[in-house]
A protein has these predicted regions:
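Soluble sensory domains of the PAS superfamily and closely related sensory modules
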Residues: 40-44, 154-159
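Acidic surface patches and DE-rich sequence motifs
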Residues: 43, 54, 112, 168
Length: 188
């Protein structure tokens, strides 16, 4: 326990010394085990609690971060993909360089006029699920968001109106945080 308290790299320490892998997600109080939720949730950053039994495991928890995050976010997205990505069905002609240039151009337009997002999504997105909705991905609750990790990281850590290009294995996602609701404390 003393080694854990002194560990500079908590993730590496947990992964090396625990049967359960490190989980770096921020969680709301409702996601913590009811028997220990109050004790853990009231800790300051760096604070520890335990050991305590949860199911078949003995646990010792350390709060490595505390912040306010929204319970839900409303998101719009334009996916600009290119040859060789999982989105490519063999008919994609755009190169990665062309996709990056198009994404940079589109993000410039929507940062100047967010009202054009839906129109541009309908014209340019390579994600057929949201093409007819103008890129509208609807409301996503933090606890069960169906977002790719890179997109989830952006939308839950930025304010309403934030727009950014996020690159991953599918291509370039132009993501806009339309609305956020119910900011609340979360611990890591």
């Amino acid at each position: 326990i003393q080694d854990f308290n002194k560990a500079q790299d908590v993730e590496a320490f947990v992964n090396q010394n625990s049967e359960m892998p490190y989980n770096g997600d921020f969680v709301f109080k409702s996601a913590l085990p009811s028997e220990s939720a109050n004790q853990i949730f009231n800790l300051e950053e760096g604070g520890t609690y335990g050991p305590y039994k949860e199911g078949d495991f003995w646990k010792y928890s350390k709060v490595t971060g505390v912040k306010q995050i929204p319970d839900s976010v409303k998101v719009r997205k334009i996916l600009v993909s290119y040859q060789g990505t999982p989105v490519d069905q063999g008919d994609m002609t755009r190169t990665q360089e062309q996709a990056e240039a198009l994404a940079d151009s589109l993000v410039g337009v929507v940062k100047n006029d967010a009202g054009k997002f839906a129109e541009l999504a309908g014209e340019y997105t390579d994600d057929p699920r949201y093409k007819d909705q103008g890129g509208d991905m609807g409301w996503n609750r933090y606890t069960n968001a169906r977002l790719m990790p890179e997109v989830k990281e952006f939308v839950y850590n930025n304010e309403e109106g934030s727009i950014e290009v996020i690159e991953n294995q599918l291509g370039y996602h132009i993501v806009m945080v339309e609305e956020v609701t119910n900011m609340q404390k979360a611990v890591q």
